[in-house]
Amino acid sequence: MSIILGIDPGSRITGYGVIRQNGRHLQYLGSGCIRMSEKELPGRLKQIYAGVSEIITQFQPDVFAIEQVFMSKNADSALKLGQARGSAIVAAVNADLPVYEYAARLIKQAVTGTGGADKSQVQHMVMSMLKLPAKPQADAADALGAAICHANTNKTLIALAGKATGARRGRYR
């Protein structure tokens, strides 16, 4: 049994989702969004770090799963997204959590069955898979998708290897 924290990074809104994996069963523990009130990027990065650290303290996850940066036509947006990811990852590493990264297409495929799914499809499937009473916010649904993707990927790796994947705690690779 493990608790997985999923993160959908963003420089203005960072989504988070927490699930418990017990064998094949996934249980919803919580989700939401960290909304940045700071205007300047350094202040927003500090808010991401503090927010993710608080979530880690509250839920005590065993694993941290985060969406990878995608290549954007706007280089400035991609750089800001990378910095937001870095703030969240540092919070996880400081808590000695193993960090796993997943491409957005892989997360969408794990949740909806297709890598080209839109946000509403991800929301609908996350709601269905976790038996939620209502659709989660889009960024929170993406974060829950990252956690679900890790749970499914981890189960597959364990089945293929016949044992745990051997990730080292607190090591970012």
Swiss-Prot record:
GO BP terms: DNA recombination; DNA repair
Subcellular location(s) per record: Cytoplasm
EC number(s) given by UniProt: 3.1.21.10
Entry keyword set: Cytoplasm, DNA damage, DNA recombination, DNA repair, DNA-binding, Endonuclease, Hydrolase, Magnesium, Metal-binding, Nuclease
GO molecular function: crossover junction DNA endonuclease activity; DNA binding; magnesium ion binding
Top-level taxon of origin: Bacteria
Cofactor requirement: Mg(2+)
Principal EC category: hydrolase
Active-site annotation: 8, 67, 139
A cellular-component GO term for this protein: cytoplasm
Reaction(s) this enzyme catalyzes, per UniProt: Endonucleolytic cleavage at a junction such as a reciprocal single-stranded crossover between two homologous DNA duplexes (Holliday junction)
Annotated binding of Mg(2+) 1, by residue: 8, 139
Acetylation found in the keyword field: no
Cross-referenced HAMAP family: RuvC
Role according to the record: The RuvA-RuvB-RuvC complex processes Holliday junction (HJ) DNA during genetic recombination and DNA repair. Endonuclease that resolves HJ intermediates. Cleaves cruciform DNA by making single-stranded nicks across the HJ at symmetrical positions within the homologous arms, yielding a 5'-phosphate and a 3'-hydroxyl group; requires a central core of homology in the junction. The consensus cleavage sequence is 5'-(A/T)TT(C/G)-3'. Cleavage occurs on the 3'-side of the TT dinucleotide at the point of strand exchange.
Quaternary structure and interacting proteins, as annotated: Homodimer which binds Holliday junction (HJ) DNA. The HJ becomes 2-fold symmetrical on binding to RuvC with unstacked arms; it has a different conformation from HJ DNA in complex with RuvA. In the full resolvosome a probable DNA-RuvA(4)-RuvB(12)-RuvC(2) complex forms which resolves the HJ.
Protein name from the UniProt record: Crossover junction endodeoxyribonuclease RuvC
